[in-house]
Swiss-Prot record:
Domain of life: Eukaryota
One GO term describing the cellular component: cytosolic ribosome
SUBUNIT field: Component of the large ribosomal subunit (LSU).
UniProt GO BP: adaxial/abaxial pattern specification; cell division; leaf morphogenesis; translation
Region described as Disordered: spans on this chain: 247-267
Subcellular location: Cytoplasm; Nucleus; Nucleus, Nucleolus; Nucleus, Nucleoplasm
Biased composition (Basic and acidic residues): 249-261
Gene3D superfamilies referenced in this protein's UniProt entry, alphabetically: 3.30.420.100
Official protein name in the record: Large ribosomal subunit protein uL18y
HAMAP family named among the record's database cross-references: Ribosomal_uL18_A
Family: Belongs to the universal ribosomal protein uL18 family.
Keyword RNA-binding in record: yes
Length: 301
């Protein structure tokens, strides 16, 4: 078979169109995005909200976002690095922390809309599937889950954040088959396993296992827990207190920043015209004075 080199003509380059920048960077799935933001044409000026969850190495970001021509508008946001204010100082990126972040965002956005008393959600997290029921006065706040580019595997942390938002009182279309504890064989959600994940039971079980088998590994893997005095038996109670604290005061707390430190100046301060003028006069006077002293010495000799 003869090898034929493919030649791109002038017309090819003339008609070539590059893909969107965020597609070229591999950051946005536009096929999924267009299905999330497309609004019915008979709904005018009605935003379609997305419940956006993203994970970094040390943080969890949860946002309520709506799309506009000018760009995406963030209505409310919650971060895992806010959780130490509510009593959770360790394990800020696991399934239980994702649940807390989703719960915090749900309570925050409902308080912003003055719907927090009307839609309390599921106060006691049992691990069972929960969907908010509409009341007679106002419909529940509806958003669509935006997972980005992650693999939506069963038990993924993003579904922990989803469960937190659902228990917080948001209306998000979902299925229970991706929550931790869902069995593929009998197609049923084991609520006890899911509850275990929500309250950090998987973390405490691993701590106990390492404590029995590999104490040295426990010291390295859970050094932050040991330093803060968090024990395996107290983890569930800690998360219960965090959930209660979030419901009590979900609003963002501004941190008090210390005054900036005054740095030593190494460059000379720029003088004004008057200061330069006075400095010159003083120098001239000093030179004249020095010249007069020399004349007096010559006369004495």
């Amino acid at each position: 078979m003869v090898f034929v080199k493919s030649s791109k003509s002038n017309a090819y380059f003339k008609r070539y169109q590059v893909k969107f920048r965020r597609r070229r960077d591999g950051k946005t799935d536009y096929r999924a995005r267009i299905r999330l933001i497309n609004q019915d044409k008979n709904k005018y000026n009605t935003p379609k909200y997305r419940f956006v969850v993203r994970f970094t190495n040390k943080d969890i970001v949860a946002q309520i976002v709506s799309a506009s021509i000018a760009g995406d508008i963030v209505k409310a946001s919650a971060y895992a690095h806010e959780l130490p204010q509510y009593g959770l100082t360790v394990g800020l990126t696991n399934y239980a922390a994702a649940y807390c972040t989703g719960l915090l965002l749900a309570r925050r956005v409902l308080k912003m809309l003055e719907m927090d008393d009307e839609y309390e959600g599921n106060v006691e997290a049992t691990g069972e599937d929960f969907s908010v029921e509409p009341t007679d006065s106002r419909r529940p706040f509806r958003a669509l889950l935006d997972v980005g580019l992650i693999r939506t595997t069963t038990g993924n942390r993003v579904f922990g954040a989803l469960k937190g938002a659902l228990d917080g009182g948001l209306d998000i279309p979902h299925s229970d088959k991706r929550f931790a504890g869902f069995h593929k064989e009998n197609k049923q959600l084991d609520a006890e396993i899911h509850r275990n994940y929500i309250y950090g039971g998987h973390v405490s079980n691993y701590m106990k296992l390492l404590g029995e088998d590999e104490p040295e590994k426990l010291q390295t893997h859970f050094s932050a827990y040991i330093k803060k005095g968090v024990e395996a038996e107290s983890i569930e109670e800690m998360y219960k207190k965090v959930h209660a604290a979030i419901r009590a005061e979900p609003n963002h707390k501004k941190t008090e920043k210390s005054a900036p430190k005054e740095h030593k100046r190494y460059n000379l301060k720029k003088l004004t015209y008057e200061e330069r003028k006075n400095k010159l006069i003083e120098r001239v006077k000093a030179l004249n004075g020095a010249g007069g002293d020399d004349d007096d010495e010559d006369d004495e000799e």
